[in-house]
Amino acid sequence: MKSTRPFHPTPVITIDGPTASGKGTVAALVAAHLGFHLLDSGALYRLAALASVRYGIDAQDIDALVKLIDDLHITFREGCAQLDGVDVSNDIRAEAVGNRASAIAVHGPVRVALVARQRAFRKTPGLVADGRDMGTVIFPDAVLKVFLTASAEARAARRHKQLMQKGFSANIENLLRDLRERDARDSNRAAAPLKPAADAKLLDTSALSVDQAVDQVLQWYRALGQPA
């Protein structure tokens, strides 16, 4: 059955889910297949988090964080995240930066400061946006909303592999504990808690390959009558 959601000339596919659920990889491949723009919303938060650390801004200093975000020079180019013209793609994936990003995201004004930047990524021919609240808050009119899930154990194993490949040392037990703590914090925060949109498609990637997950998203998109 086709969606009754109104047609938008610039379609958006949202892919939300917890940390290390595979949403970033799936989103990038779906975007590449469709020729769409890509928004890694988590990278925006991590860029703000990294900048706050580098400039010595406390995670609880809301006014300073908002001003920092307003003044940040952020660009995404050829798969790289740049802060002030410098590629910081590896820096923002460090666990400490991820924890800081989750900590500052609990502040409503911080989220408001980043919303406009996220929505500005919606450009023709379309956008694939991955994050935690893309389908519930940022793009509620998305033509397709996907929420990825996976067991904490599977996600910890993926995160461990990612970090080791990038040259970071990591302990899988510590990663598993951190993931569970972040899940609880992200799910229980007052502003835009981590949860699937009411009309989201749920996709458990625990036992799926990346290609299988991408194929499922594309099948759902085609089922809406969209060219894929």
UniProtKB/Swiss-Prot annotation:
Keyword tRNA-binding: no
Cellular location(s): Cytoplasm
Organism field: Burkholderia vietnamiensis (strain G4 / LMG 22486) (Burkholderia cepacia (strain R1808))
Family stated for the protein in its record: Belongs to the cytidylate kinase family. Type 1 subfamily.
Gene Ontology CC: cytosol
Keyword Nucleotide-binding applies: yes
Domain of life where this protein originates: Bacteria
Gene: cmk
Record Pfam families: Cytidylate_kin (PF02224)
Binding, ATP: G17, P18, T19, A20, S21, G22, K23, G24, T25
Name of the molecule in the record: Cytidylate kinase
